[in-house]
Amino acid sequence: MATLSTHPNYGFHLGQAQGLEDYAPQSQLQLSPGMDMDIKRVLHYSQSLAAMGGSPNGPAGQGVNGSSGMGHHMSSHMTPHHMHQAVSAQQTLSPNSSIGSAGSLGSQSSLGSNGSGLNSSSGHQSAGMHSLATSPGQEGHIKRPMNAFMVWSRLQRRQIAKDNPKMHNSEISKRLGAEWKLLAESEKRPFIDEAKRLRALHMKEHPDYKYRPRRKPKNPLTAGPQGGLQMQAGGMGQQKLGAGPGAGAGGYNPFHQLPPYFAPSHHLDQGYPVPYFGGFDPLALSKLHQSQAAAAAAVNNQGQQQGQAPPQLPPTSLSSFYSGIYSGISAPSLYAAHSANAAGLYPSSSTSSPGSSPGTITPNGMDGSMDSALRRPVPVLY
């Protein structure tokens, strides 16, 4: 190693080579004119040794021959740029410098490979962006021609966005709309003419164009479940109150003015349900009236025998009647009036108990007992 460092053909010693930076990039490595001459001298010496085939005696000569052969091989297969790096590696022959040259070569090769990878990846990205840019046109979507406001706002929007980069797009649109409304007709005229020209050009390019707006599908839940329920309930109410097979023959319904089942209130237009009164059917009322008349006749018969006791109706009939009526709403005056009408519907259907005589009961007495029975307060569970 000492002989190589003091060889007469080498223009500098190892001490000079130790001052160079390890792993230095090629752009930062600057060669002096003296070092360039030394490199040329080493190349000439190595080529002459390779041509002669001889080598100096001793281990040092073998090392120089091996290094010269390697230098000749590298010089024949590498570019001058890489040759300078290989020659600098032969000249220094120190561990740090040799590692530095190898590291520089490795780093350069790795950079070259990475650079090719970056170039290929950038090429793929550019191709992908190009395909994305051309994809809307491939779908065949034709844009609508711009109107006068769009022609005017296209330039104004750019200017506002340039002056206020932090302003949101919605705020810019609001400002543009307000400014467009404040413009005079004479100021709008150039943009209106431009919009007409663009429309005529669009019709010429696309004669078969027809604007087809893409309507958003309506959610069935937004229509409101109450709406469908009210329509269905309205039909049911009409069927309940409609003319049946025996309605026109002689059946009179005194409760035709009641609201239908689940009918919405008209003053509030809200779908609060109103319950249907099943106790107001004519058949049920006739049975109730017969039971009340029989109970009243029995009470009157007992009152005549026991000194006119206060008439009392069986609680079962009244409880069944009012339990059927007061299902979800309280209107005592309405039901009292209907009960009175129901009592007046059947004036001749008075029946007496089996043990009473037919001549002891008068219609006036029965009416008085019915009035007293209907005027009594009845406890109602709300």
From Swiss-Prot:
UniProt main location, coarse: nucleus
DNA-binding region(s), residue ranges: 142-210
Molecular-function GO terms, alphabetical: DNA binding; DNA binding, bending; DNA-binding transcription activator activity, RNA polymerase II-specific; DNA-binding transcription factor activity; DNA-binding transcription factor activity, RNA polymerase II-specific; DNA-binding transcription factor binding; mRNA 3'-UTR binding; RNA polymerase II cis-regulatory region sequence-specific DNA binding
Residues passing through the membrane, by range: none
GO BP annotations, alphabetical order: axon guidance; blastoderm segmentation; brain development; central nervous system development; dendrite guidance; dorsal/ventral axis specification; hindgut morphogenesis; instar larval development
Tissue specificity annotation: Initially expressed in a pair-rule-like pattern which is rapidly replaced by strong neuroectoderm expression.
InterPro entries: HMG_box_dom, HMG_box_dom_sf, SRY-related_HMG-box_TF-like
Alphabetically ordered keywords of this record: Developmental protein, DNA-binding, Nucleus
Bias (Low complexity) ranges: 96-123, 347-360
Entry's Gene Ontology cellular component terms: cytoplasm; nucleus
DNA-binding keyword on record: yes
Pfam family, one: HMG_box
Region annotation Disordered: where it falls in the sequence: 53-142, 346-382
Record note on disruption phenotype: Flies exhibit severe segmentation defects, including loss and/or fusion of abdominal denticle belts and stripe-specific defects in pair-rule and segment polarity gene expression. Mutant embryos also exhibit loss of specific neurons, fusion of adjacent ventral nerve cord ganglia and aberrant axon scaffold organization.
Residue spans of biased composition, Gly residues class: 60-69
Keyword Nucleus in record: yes
Subcellular location per the Swiss-Prot or TrEMBL entry: Nucleus
Job of this protein: Essential for segmentation and CNS development. May modulate the actions of other transcription factors, including gap and pair-rule proteins.
Protein name, entry field: SOX domain-containing protein dichaete
Species of origin: Drosophila melanogaster
